[in-house]
Amino acid sequence: ANPFILSLGSKETATRRLNLAQAFNPMGSLSGMAVASFIVLPQLWSDRRDAAGKLLFSTLSEAEKADIRLHDLAVIRDPYVAIGLVVLAILVIIAITRMPKTQTDNAELTNVRATLSNLWHNRIYREGVATQMFYVAAQIMTWTFIIQYADYLGIDKATAQKYNILAMTLFLSGRFISTFLMKYINTRRLLMLFAIGAAICSLGAIFIVGIVGLYSLVGISIFMSLMFPTIYGIALENVDAKDTALGAAFLVMAIVGGALMPPLQGLIIDQYQVFGLPAVNASFVLP
């Protein structure tokens, strides 16, 4: 879908179009978090506690536990059924909609070896793939460990999840804000300014111990908002139409960075202190 969006108009506005299209992705993530936090979790009987805060589930008979499992399964199942129906409806709409022809549809096919050679010798593309890999790693680390950061401050997990929702809300808002700003500010310059903002917030998350540090961590999300689609668009700017499909595939594969780096951050968090800082704070040196 991303190469399709890039090819639908002029190259000058391609990255802006992609940012606008990608602005709808966080809506799904935010909706999922909201459904889990405000609809699913409060209805789970297995999570009920007594006045002392202890789970009641372990004190029940096997028959009562079986009833609770069936109830909780239904609570969790129903949202997925609804999502499946919505996805099916979207699939039908796409199937019956005539898509416009694009530059990539008319491009001549070339062999894989030639395409790989073209991509490898394109410096902007090559650096774009590397940048995308490290960006995705930073994004996943930032979001994965918000709850651990809040937990260190004595904030319970239910409240900590709300900070996750706040981060995703800022991320969603940032996508629309950055799309608007691209009308007036050069795409590369805007990417640089947002990267500086993310770095400043990261320093706050590392060196400020307390609630201000937590808000700094959450604030990184607004600056991350434009990065994936903008890096993607810039990397493919000078790629020939015949090489776009494979080039786009490597950019998507760059998300492997999100799987490689979080375990390393987890190892740092497992330490008590690092250079005089709480380990959870120091771990954000990585992103």
Residue ranges and their predicted role:
Residues P100-G128:
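Juxtamembrane intracellular "pre-TM" segments in multi-pass secondary transporters
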Residues L41-I83, L264-P287:
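A membrane-interface helix-boundary motif in multi-pass transporters
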